[in-house]
């Protein structure tokens, strides 16, 4: 940990970039009820707001990878933070669902240049024994951003409306982009080899297992982020304050479990950590469907946040050990594309299931089954080299 913190600019710049990404991506979910009412959306269209983002995010993976290879992770990450912030500001001017989905698509397309270049930056500055911890510290930014959004956006919406609150978030994101550019730094010997499809080990079963696992991991994560606030209000009758508290608990768990997952992976191995994380997630999702209220509900929200964030860093830090450091960037980019596709599909499907069945239960059972599948597939992945 001490050696990781010897590079504070890299850690802080990456932290801020991921925090801003999370704020811009999830701010609308905290006022989704207001958006849904004003734009007259059903649950399927409400789910399309998250899916529209990840259509753009998926399409942006390869172009941003090329930009990062050619101009460096620093410029790519700062430019991406700027792009998603401007798109969020424009989302606040949406007058119909077509405009709203278009701006969400643009947010995803322009925001796709933060995470994978960040992984590349971590790989260049930290050795194999430090990467999991470093990436875990960076990803605390994601959970911190969601906590901030879950409190600030609903409070601002009372006086500014949902539109004004999202516009203000966009302006603050533009400032964040400049700060990220100041603190981040590319390493001189950073590998600048461009994306080469020959680097992708399509003949390796473990590559495909990891791709499916990433589809499930991020899809499940954003299903909770997109729908949890509305579920807590509709199914549990929580107030805005109580819902914000619950979402803060979900994301506070991520602040703790992101670095914990990275450190556990450095010590016990990514494979064991990922198997434990996915099986735990399945169990907690099933318990969530029981409709338990009171303190138990808040405990379950914490455990869901813990288990789903515990797998994030190991899911990427395992890649160099399996496929080599030189191909880690290309493999991470492809894996992240699968992850983005999962985040595109699963939130939309849950909204469709809710419209069709008038209940969230079947959707939650499906996410639990996919979590079980991810744990089983992880058992088939080869052991990474030390």
Residue ranges and their predicted role:
Residues 270-318:
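C-terminal transmembrane helical hairpin of 12-TM major facilitator-type secondary transporters
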Residues 10-43, 224-229, 346:
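Extracytoplasmic
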Residues 137-184:
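Helix-loop-helix hairpin linking two adjacent transmembrane segments in secondary transporters
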Residues 59-95, 271:
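Conserved MFS/SLC helix-loop-helix module at the cytosolic interface between two early adjacent transmembrane helices
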Residues 40, 72, 93-99, 127, ...:
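Helix-breaking motifs and short loop linkers at transmembrane-helix boundaries and internal kinks
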Residues 28-29, 206-258:
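Extracytoplasmic gate region of multi-pass secondary transporters
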Residues 87, 98-106, 295-303:
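Paired small-residue
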Residues 103-141:
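Cytoplasmic helix-loop-helix junction between adjacent transmembrane helices
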